[in-house]
Structures are given as C-alpha cells and as structure tokens.
Amino acid sequence: MSESIDINVYSQTTIPNAMAELMDNHNKMEQISAYCKSLYANGDAAQAYEQTQGYAKNALLNVAYHIQTVGTHITSLLQLQTNEMEKLNIEIQTLTQRVRMIHDSTGTNVFSNQDAAKPYKSSLKNRKVDTEATKAPVKYVHKPISYGISASDINQNGVPPPLNHSNSSANLTSSSGHLAASSTSNSSTPSYQSPSYSSQPTISSGTPPPIQKQPPRVGNAPPPPSLSVPAAPPPPVMNVPPPPPTSQRPSSVNNNAPSNDFPPPPPPSSSSSGGDLPPPPSFGLPPPPTLGDDFPPPPPPPVGSYDFPPPPARPQSQFYDHNDFPPPPPPM
C-alpha cells in the first residue's frame, strides 16, 4: 500500500516540481547572459569576463543538479513500478497455478486450451452412400400366406410347384387387388381333419366298409394328404415240435381223455413190495442197438505224430483275459 502511495506522490508531485525548478533555472540563465553582454558594452572587459565566467559555472552546476534530481525521481518511480509489476506477476502466476490445480482435481482441464489447433484433413471425405442415388425403402405390407395353386403355376408336365413360405411372402410390392383376393380365398379355406382309422380292420359279412367322404375343395386349395394304414405284423413263430401222428399213438389211450400230445402215465403196480416196473410204451420206433464186444479196436496213431514238443503253457497274468471266460452258449 505504501509503494502505491509513493508511486502516486512521485508521479503527481515530486517529478513535476523538479521539472518546474529545472525550467526556472533555464529562464535565469537567459537573464544572466543578457547581464554579461551589457557589462562588456559599458564597463571594463576584464572584470566583465571574470563575472561572466563565474555566472556560467554556477548556471551549469544548477542545471546539472536539477537534471540529476529529475532523473533520480524518475528512476525511483520506475523502480516502484517495476516492483509493483513483479508483485502483480507473482499474484497472477499463483492464481493461474491454483486454477490449474482446481481443473486437474475436478476434471475440467479440457476447457483450459480453448484455442487448441484442430487437425483438418486436406482430402475430402469418401462418401459411401451417395445422396442422389439413394432410394426410399420399400414400405412393409402385411401379406398372408397363400396356399392356393392357380392354373398358371402348374408347369408343362402337370406338376404344381412346391409350397415355399419365403416365395409366398417375398413379393411385398404386389397390388392391392391381388392382396384382397388372396386374403378372401385364405379366409374361406376350411381346416382339414385327418380321417380316423383303427389298427385292426373290421370284417363284415357281405357289406363293404363305408367310404369316408372328403370335404369339398374351396378355391385353389390343395387336396388333403392321403393317410396309409400300416399292415399288422405277422404273429411270432414258436419253436414247438409237431404232434405225433394218430397212427403211432398207443391203443391203450382212452378215447375220452383230453386230446394232448403226450400219453397218460402208466397205472400203479398192484404189488406193494415194489416189483419190476412195466416196460415203457413204444411209439413204433425200432429198438436201440445192443452194445457188445464186437466193435473193432481203434486204429493206432500215425507214426511221427508225437515228434513235436507240446506247446508251452500260457503264462498266468494277474489280470483277466478274454480267453479265461467260457464260450458263450449257442443261439436258441
């Protein structure tokens, strides 16, 4: 605060007063030079020279003094202004540093460089879609699926084209009349039901089974699919031996006994002591041959059949081998 007051005093009072004294001394030097000229004209020249020389020294000293005083005051004023500028510079730097710290802490440092250089590309942008060649998108039209087949859709061989959902709904830009006709034909198409059938065919004497009528076809609707009834599988064949003929059955069989393939058991023996059992019944088969001593001895083995050593024994492993298990039973 004191320096600011000093600056004001120097700039408003001290320096103007020093300049005024300098100008006053300059005016007095003009008066002294006019007085010295009059001495040379009216008086002694040697005395006038000495007085003029003394006045000139004093005038120069006064001028130098006043110039020095004014210069000193101006230098002091400039020094005060320099000090004040340094203080202002320090305060500005302090405020700038504080603002940067606040921007860094709050994340708003992007606003510090408002005059940042922007990169401009020298080449023009390559437009991928030309605005002149663009067309308006096709408006979506809800079109129901048409299952009808017209005469124009049948080819030369008389085979209708297969139904395809994508083909029937792909043309979205069809006329309104075709849409109305297709919607009318589809709304009147009945829902077909498959005819009921049974796995076992019913056989009636003399009367054929009734023929189920198909529902009438409306418009260009395709015929309903035909259902094929699979044939019933044949019964399995059991491996049961055929019964013996009636001629080989024993005559002791009662006619009132149930008809089966096996003879009845023999009657129990009348003797309680357990005598000889009756012989088994014969079914007309020849008796078995009797074993006797009439068979010839077996032929001797060929010579040299035992020249080879026996095969080595298979090593016993700690783990199971697939050869250790018995062979599987024959199929039934």
Curated annotation (Swiss-Prot):
One of its GO terms (molecular function) is signaling adaptor activity. Belongs to the ABI family. Residues 73-104 form a coiled coil. Transmembrane segments: none annotated. Residues 152-332 are annotated as: Disordered. Residues 221-247, 277-314 have a biased composition (Pro residues). Part of a Scar/WAVE complex containing brk1, scrA, abiA, pirA and napA. Interacts with scrA. Disruption phenotype: Cells show no developmental defects, mild motility defects and serious defects in cytokinesis. GO terms for biological process: cell motility; chemotaxis to folate; establishment of protein localization; filopodium assembly; mitotic cytokinesis; pseudopodium assembly; sorocarp development. Residues 164-206 have a biased composition (Low complexity). This is Abl interactor homolog. Involved in regulation of actin and microtubule organization. Required for proper cytokinesis. Gene3D superfamilies: 6.10.140.1620. Keywords: Cell cycle, Cell division, Coiled coil. Residues 248-257 have a biased composition (Polar residues). Disulfide bonds: none annotated. GO terms for cellular component: actin-based cell projection; cell leading edge; cell-cell junction; filopodium tip; lamellipodium; pseudopodium; SCAR complex.
